[in-house]
Regions:
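Short amphipathic alpha-helices within nucleic acid-binding modules
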Residues: 18-22, 65-69, 77-90
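Short, structured motif recognition centered on aromatic/hydrophobic residues
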Residues: 4-9, 20, 32, 67-73
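A common structural junction motif
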Residues: 28, 92-93
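Glycine-rich beta-strand-turn "strand-cap" elements at beta-sheet edges
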Residues: 37-64, 93-125
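Core segments of cupin and vicinal oxygen chelate
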Residues: 17-40
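Alpha-helix boundary/capping residues
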Residues: 24-27, 88, 101-102, 109
Length: 125
């Protein structure tokens, strides 16, 4: 497997988005970058649009998503991902300080991670 991305989607607990963003930007992202992670982007999902065709007519339904946080990380290959996961998530700092705080801000049972490979024309490689 060659280079790929993780698209990570979290549900932030109600009323915790500002606190989560501060924690991500001041603590988690710098910590993970220091450990070797490559972060391509960090986003708040404002809304989702779903499209369908009904009776030959295209329709769009929009849903507000103010508690959804999305970020993208890049890995060289599966071994690189496993090495960085171990360096981050098995570290004393993560287990004793960062991880417990994460559990106070997001619903860890709702985390979704999509592994993506860029297509030939993608600018993200």
């Amino acid at each position: 497997m060659s280079a790929f991305f993780e698209l990570r989607i979290y549900q932030v607990l109600p009323g915790k988005m500002e606190e989560w963003l501060t924690f991500m930007e001041d603590t988690i992202i710098p910590y993970q970058v220091k450990k070797g992670m490559v972060i391509h982007g960090s986003f708040v999902m404002d809304s989702s649009d779903e499209f369908s065709v009904q009776n030959g007519e295209r329709t769009m339904n929009s849903e507000t998503k103010g508690n959804t946080y999305v970020w993208i990380r890049r890995f060289e290959n599966k071994d690189h991902k496993e090495k960085l996961y171990k360096a981050v998530y098995e570290s004393t700092d993560w287990m004793n300080e960062i991880g417990p705080r994460v559990a106070q801000l997001i619903d860890r049972n709702s985390i979704v991670v999509h592994n993506l490979t860029s297509t030939q024309l993608s600018i993200m490689k």
